[in-house]
Amino acid sequence: MKLRQLVLAATVAVAGLSSALVSTVATAQTKEQFFPVLVYRTGAYAPNGVPFANGYVDYLKLVNARGGINGVKVSFEECETGYATDRGVECYERLKGKNGGATVFQPLSTGITFALTEKAPGDKIPLITAGYGRSESADGNVFKWNFPLAGTYWVAGDVIIQDIVKKVGGADKLKGKHIALVYHDSPFGKEAIPILQERAAMHGFKLSLLPVTHPGVEQKSTWLQIRRDRPDFVLNWGWGVMNSTLLKEAQATGYPREQIYGVWWAGAEPDVKDIGAGAKGYNAITMQHGAEKGSAVVKEVLEKLHAKGQGTGPKDEVGEVLYMRGLFSAMFGIEGVRQAQEKYGKGKVMTGEQARWGYENLNLTQPKLDALGFKGVLRPISTSCADHMGANWARIHTWNGSKWEFTSDWYQADDQIIKPMVKAAADKYAAEKKLNRRTPADCQS
């Protein structure tokens, strides 16, 4: 009898200990803010996808090195999409419920963004598409869960035309000019078309649309047409190997690189480094940042991570264009959580729904950005229920044969053109999906 009681007591004690251990583990897990990381480190777009992923992951590591988000440490898990929409959706489904639930997804693909836009509201997980994705999702009154922070492709297209206007000596000088858009034949590439058509109608220039099939290595027919028509300017809405191919074709055709403008996914080191001096004069838009090797945040990453063997990827790529894009995209994800903690509790893990409120109420002032190490890199970003973009500043940088350098002042996209376009497209989406615009009460939730 005594033996039985001792065994029973021991069993209860072990059960209690196990319960305590499970509770401790669960508590430890819930004290981490989970960020799924969709990447493409393999495939045709890997040369551009890898540096972005390295910058993104390094910033998450840096946050932990700084002590977390008000003490809450960050956890993350990568999932390889290969830039394929179906694989991106698979990654979303696999990671959305992990480690207490996903905070936010950043698809790094307009195609994946379109697919997840349909899923995120039901799962109550926000999407950040910093400088890409659906341009009309800047309208937060319709797209409650989408945040194209810092700009959209319509902002990019508008600012490129503004720089061309300056180059030709005024808007009136655009009349009769010919601009050719060479674009990746995908949702990403097609995003440029509406704003350029709008500007063409305003200024009276001819717009030619020249699609290029994935992945973009076959452009012979495109450049035969450009050689024949000799447009005044060529816009490159490319990604991955399409960009270097385009510049090589331009070189072979004798088309002046000074008259070519790339979207910001076509204006990084992998796009030009193999061509070097042959790409000199090529322009690309930057949604605020460029290569920022001298920035405070880069110095901190090198000191706190790479100097200790904890960095992600090659040390000499830290601060390059796409690395910086990953870095600042991760920063947006973190700062939305920090903002949410102001409402829902400092030092607490935020749900995706709570984080969404943070992204909708971002107020990244210049002093805040400077304190985070982004002085001279980013301008203030402030979102609201109606405005999920938060800023519309951009610059042009130009390849000088060995590095990118800024060649323009700051531009702001023309809201008189873009806002009506955004509203019309958002209204069309709402009608198709049978959605109502958000009420003031919903905006406060």
What are the residue ranges of the model-derived segments?
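Extracellular/periplasmic Venus flytrap/periplasmic-binding protein
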Residues: 86-90, 135-136, 144-254, 292-299
